[in-house]
């Protein structure tokens, strides 16, 4: 205290850290095959390569969490509106020819908190160019997510397969 007095503690709580998990540890399957998110690439920090119709929100690590949630929600609405307009049922981010040789980077760069480092091996990789980035910067996200076209060549739109 500023006065120099001390207050005895009744209890001291020590924490070893938060353990994050990927998407709530829900088992996702695509065409019967389990998805290993560590083998995917992050698409704009909100979707996963070769996983159709899935968008998730992970807020900013250095700004308001809800700020990014709003950006992702806006993108999701634009994506759904595009699908309705084009009559497509699946939106799947896929690596293009020019993306094949990308240098892999951690899902989130330059954040050393233990809770993040302990789970980084479970998360998708980040590339070295858009749209395969998770920049964690609102100015970059506004260009890459809010202002860029939905049909950017990496997001593939298809009609649902007929059930046999």
Residue ranges and their predicted role:
Residues 1-70, 74-81, 153-164:
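Flavin (primarily FAD) cofactor-binding/catalytic cores of flavoenzymes
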């Amino acid at each position: 205290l500023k006065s120099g007095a001390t207050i005895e503690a009744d209890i001291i709580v020590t924490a070893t850290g938060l353990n994050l998990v990927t998407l709530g540890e829900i088992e996702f399957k695509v065409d019967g095959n389990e998805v290993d998110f560590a083998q995917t690439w992050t698409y704009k920090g909100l979707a996963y390569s070769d996983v159709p119709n899935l968008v998730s929100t992970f807020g900013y690590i250095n700004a308001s969490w809800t700020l990014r949630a709003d950006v992702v929600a806006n993108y999701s609405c634009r994506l759904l509106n595009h699908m309705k307009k084009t009559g497509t049922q699946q939106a799947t981010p896929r690596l293009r020819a020019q993306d094949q040789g990308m240098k892999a980077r951690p899902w989130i760069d330059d954040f050393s908190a233990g809770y993040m480092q302990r789970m980084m091996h479970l998360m998708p990789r980040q590339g070295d160019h858009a749209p395969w980035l998770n920049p964690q910067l609102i100015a970059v996200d506004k260009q890459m997510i809010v202002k860029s076209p939905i049909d950017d060549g990496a997001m593939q739109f298809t009609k649902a397969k007929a059930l046999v």
